[in-house]
Design a protein with these regions (language model features):
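Structural motif
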Residues: 89, 307-310, 336-337
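Conserved beta-strand segments of alpha/beta enzyme cores
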Residues: 108, 269-271, 354
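Generic enzyme active-site microenvironment
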Residues: 272, 306, 333
Length: 455
C-alpha cells in the first residue's frame, strides 16, 4: 500500500454532486497539483476535515470545475491513510476529467473495494464491518440497511469476539496442560471448561440460526405464482407490482416462460416469478415453460397458489396444488372474488390452511394478501446487526460450531488434552477467518473485488 489510489466515488450519471476520492501517502502532493483553494494556500496546508472552496485546474491552468475539497489525515481517516475528497458538480464528463488529472499526477486507478480493503488492512475495521459497507450500498429494504448499519457499528463483531475470547481462555488452559502433562484437570476446572465450551456452542448455534433470515432479508423471498393456465397469475403479478409487467389475454398459455419481478411489501422483499400454467401440453415451447415453472417452485420459499373461484376445480388445479405443496410456505389465493365462488373453501383450508379471496381485476383483497405474506416473514428479535448475511459468514460459523461440539464431547468423555486443544484451535481458526484476524490474502482480495470502484 505504498502507492496512492484515486477513483470516482459516486454514480456516473448527471447529478448535483459527484465525488473524487484519494487515499495514500502522496495524497497531499496530488491535491496540490490539481486543486487550488480560493484563499491561496495549498490544499496540503489547509485545516484538516474542513471543506475548502477552490477550483480544479488542468495542466494548462484551465478551469475544469469549481469544487470543494476536504483532507482527512491518517491514521484517523476511513482508510487509515491520508485521504481526500473533491466534491465537483455531478457531470460524468467533469468527474472523468478530474480523475484523469489525479492519475496524471501520480495516483493509480483504484480497484473495486480498494478503499475499504485498505481500511481493513490498516485495522480501521474488521472483515465483518467491511462486508457491512457493501451490504449498506446494496440494501434494497430499510431492514437490510438497518442490519448492515448495526454490523458496521460492530454488533456482530462483538458477538464473534466474545466467543473468540472465551475459546482463547479454553485453549490457553489446555496449552498449559499439554506443556505440563503431570498436571491433571481438576473436577472444578473441568466443569468450568465444559461450561465455557457449552456457552460458545450455544452462541454459535444462535448465530448460525440467523443465516436463513439474513439471506431472505438481503436476497429477498423467492416467490412463485402457480396455477393452471388463464387463472389470473399474470393479472395478479401486475396488480402486485402496480403496472403491466406480464402480458394478459384471454388465451390460455400466454405466459410460456417465467417472468421475474422484485416487489417490496412492507419489510418483505419478494422475488416474484410468474410461471407458465401447470398443465400437460403438446406445444414444445409451452412445455419447456411448464418445466421451468416446476423448477422455480422447487427453489421457492413461498408459493402463491392461484385458483379460479368462479369454476370448479380441475385436474390442472390438482397438478398445480401438488407442485405448491413442495414449497416451505404457501398461500392459497382464490381469484375472481368479484364473481360468485363455487369452490369448497373449507376443504382447501383443511389442506392448506388459510385461503385468501382476491380479485386481480378490481384489487379487492390485495391488502389482506400483502398482510398475510408479511405475517409469514416477521421482523426477527435479533439485535440490529447480528444477522449472518452471506455464505462465507455462515460457513465459518458452521465450522467453528462443529469444532466446539467436538471439543466439548472430547472433554466430556475424557479424551486426552491435545485432542480437545486441536478442536478448540480449529474453532479459533474459523472465527479468525470470520472476522479477518486470520485469513488468506487471496480470500481477502476475492471478498473486496465484489465491491464497487470508489468504495
Amino acid at each position: 500500500m505504498s502507492d496512492t489510489i484515486a477513483a470516482i466515488a459516486t454514480a456516473q450519471s448527471p447529478s448535483a454532486i459527484g465525488i473524487l476520492r484519494l487515499s495514500g501517502p502522496d495524497t497531499r502532493n496530488v491535491l496540490d497539483a490539481v486543486f487550488f483553494p480560493r484563499n491561496g494556500r495549498p490544499m496540503s496546508q489547509q485545516t484538516a476535515r474542513t471543506m475548502v472552496l477552490g477550483r480544479v485546474l488542468d495542466g494548462e491552468g484551465r478551469v475544469v470545475d469549481s469544487a470543494l475539497c476536504v483532507l482527512f489525515p491518517g491514521p484517523d481517516s476511513y482508510t487509515g491513510e491520508d485521504c481526500a475528497e473533491i466534491h465537483c458538480h455531478g457531470s460524468p464528463v467533469v468527474l472523468n476529467e478530474g480523475l484523469k488529472l489525479l492519475l496524471s499526477h501520480g495516483a493509480r486507478q483504484a480497484k473495486g473495494g480498494e478503499f475499504t480493503q485498505r481500511a481493513f488492512l490498516n485495522g480501521r475495521m474488521d472483515l465483518l464491518q467491511a462486508e457491512a459497507v457493501a451490504d449498506i450500498i446494496d440494501a434494497e429494504t430499510a431492514e437490510t440497511a438497518r442490519n448492515a448499519a448495526g454490523q458496521l457499528e460492530g454488533v456482530l463483531s462483538r458477538s464473534v469476539q466474545a466467543v473468540y475470547d472465551t475459546l482463547m481462555g479454553v485453549t490457553s488452559r489446555f496449552y498449559a496442560i499439554v506443556d505440563y502433562p503431570d498436571e491433571d484437570i481438576e473436577d472444578l476446572q473441568r466443569e468450568q471448561l465444559l461450561d465455557a465450551l457449552r456457552e460458545s456452542e450455544n452462541k454459535l448455534t444462535e448465530l448460525l440460526a440467523t443465516f436463513s433470515r439474513g439471506q431472505l432479508m438481503k436476497q429477498g423471498v423467492p416467490t412463485v405464482l402457480l396455477g393452471k393456465p388463464n387463472v389470473g397469475k399474470s393479472s395478479l403479478l401486475n396488480a402486485l407490482v402496480g403496472y403491466d409487467r406480464a402480458i394478459v389475454t384471454d388465451v390460455a398459455g400466454t405466459t410460456r416462460d417465467t417472468v421475474e419481478e422484485s416487489l417490496l411489501l412492507g419489510h418483505v422483499l419478494l422475488r416474484l416469478t410468474d410461471t407458465a400454467g401447470i398443465r400437460e401440453t403438446g406445444d414444445a415451447v409451452e412445455r419447456l415453460g411448464v418445466e421451468r415453472s416446476r423448477k422455480a417452485a422447487q427453489r421457492a420459499s413461498l408459493a402463491l397458489l392461484l385458483l379460479d373461484g368462479s369454476v370448479p376445480l380441475e385436474q390442472q388445479d390438482e397438478e398445480a396444488m401438488a407442485v405448491a405443496e413442495s414449497a416451505p410456505h404457501r398461500l392459497v389465493v382464490v381469484n375472481k372474488s368479484d364473481l360468485p365462488c363455487v369452490l369448497d373453501k373449507a376443504a382447501l383450508e383443511k389442506r392448506f390452511g388459510s385461503v385468501l379471496a382476491v380479485s386481480a381485476k378490481t384489487g379487492a383483497g390485495m391488502a389482506a394478501l400483502c398482510e398475510a405474506i408479511g405475517a409469514l416473514y416477521p421482523t426477527g428479535a435479533e439485535p440490529q446487526g447480528e444477522l449472518l448475511t452471506n455464505a462465507r459468514q455462515a460457513d465459518a460459523v458452521r465450522r467453528a460450531l462443529s469444532c466446539v461440539k467436538n471439543a466439548h464431547a472430547s472433554l466430556q468423555f475424557g479424551m486426552t488434552p491435545d485432542v480437545v486443544l486441536t478442536d478448540a484451535e480449529g474453532a479459533l481458526e474459523a472465527l479468525g477467518e470470520l472476522n479477518g484476524k486470520h485469513i488468506r490474502e487471496d480470500l481477502v482480495d476475492t471478498i473486496f473485488s465484489r465491491f464497487c470502484v470508489g468504495k
